[in-house]
Amino acid sequence: MRWYVSIGAVLVAGVLAGGDVAGVAAPSPQNQFSSQLSSFAPGRQSADKEATPSVDVELILAVDVSYSMDMDELAIQREGYAQAIVSREFLQALKSGPNGKIAVTYFEWAASSDQKIIIPWRVIDGPETADAVANEIMKTPIRRASRTSISGAINFAMPLFDENPYRGLRRVIDISGDGPNNNGGPVVVARDAAIEKGIVINGLPIMVKEPSYSTMDIDNLDFYYEDCVIGGPGAFVVTIKDREKFKEAIRTKLLLEVAGRTPERPVVPAVAASKEPRVSCLIGEKIWQDRWGR
């Protein structure tokens, strides 16, 4: 089941002490070559399992840097992630897991062929490693790029899980953005491919500006994220509608993801899979075609 949560609906105490634990996505199966090796060496699979560093979650932070984001928003977004990672609440949530550590990578995205890894896979297991990741996020120059391809971000993220040396109880892609997909393949195709791999996708739709006909903004970006972007056991959306609560929203979402919990007080359940989405999942492509004819 997928849920939407507004800022303030989740308190730190609830994240750490209350609510039901989200469904755990099974780790991706070993590749065919590894499976063949294990069939010839019965002890190999067990040995590999013990040798692989275990973490509570493999977390990919996929951050929109398209031109629809203004420079202030990009700066606040960066600061929000950096401050959340070093916050007392985050570090406390980190220690609540069975392994007391997570693996995280952070990349920025725009068009379907435009993704840039800012933080390669790192383990966060306490204040020192959290500080190192936060500092690395902040020291990288802010950039902007054209087009918005959520599908491209998901497709770029999926193989990153298989390339990292860690083994998590959950695999989560955390997508933030301020507009619908308008480039690359359909977002639902990418989303469904991720779900099939046991990956959970959570969303952070940014709605701090009034939609304008001259832009790619849409009125119900939160519905779009709920119905077209997020998916997997316990998937949820945290919507930002107030610039002043930008950083709070990021911290709330990261706390939930690290603690492996769904929001305590879900506000609006996502539309059932058998029903039509409340917003067309191709609305971004349609707007682009109507305005620019390509």
Where is each model-derived feature located?
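C-terminal "exit" segments of structured domains
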Residues: 238-294
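DG-centered beta-turn motif at the end of beta-strands
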Residues: 64, 157, 169-183, 194, ...
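Second-shell loop/turn segments in exported
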Residues: 62-72, 104, 120-121, 136-147, ...
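Acidic, polar low-complexity linker/tail segments
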Residues: 23-60, 66-75, 195
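Von Willebrand factor
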Residues: 53-118, 129-176, 203-216, 220, ...
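Short beta-strand-loop
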Residues: 97-136, 213-226
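VWA/integrin I-like adhesion module and closely mimicked acidic/polar interface patches used
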Residues: 94, 179-227
